[in-house]
């Protein structure tokens, strides 16, 4: 059985520490140290009012965030919980995913 950890972008009040360089590094390293197998980010390029009201202010670009976490860790697998395809050019999305 494998366990993954999802970036807590909508788990409560907005916390800017979770989206900065230091916060992402600490989060990824903590997930790896705790034994998680993967870290995930959800794609919400255009959040609606319901999403924002639930605290979804920290929706990072998943591929940029995953690349950052990959550079900070040594064994975590990377995943997107959602990649909203209609918002993205399919060729650029494929290249970003392949690069990460």
Question: Which residue ranges define each predicted feature?
Answer:
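N-terminal beta1-alpha1-beta2 module of alpha/beta enzyme domains
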Residues: 1-72
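Glycine-rich anion/phosphate-binding loops
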Residues: 18-26, 86-99
């Amino acid at each position: 059985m494998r366990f993954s950890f999802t970036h807590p972008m909508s788990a409560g009040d907005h916390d800017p520490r979770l989206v900065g360089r230091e916060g992402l590094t600490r989060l990824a390293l903590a997930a790896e140290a705790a034994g998680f197998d993967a870290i995930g980010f959800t794609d919400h390029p255009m959040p609606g009012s319901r999403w924002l009201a639930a605290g979804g202010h920290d929706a990072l670009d998943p591929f940029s965030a995953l690349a950052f976490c990959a550079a900070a860790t040594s064994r975590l697998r990377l995943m997107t919980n959602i990649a909203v395809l209609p918002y993205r050019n399919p060729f650029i999305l494929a290249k970003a995913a392949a690069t990460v």
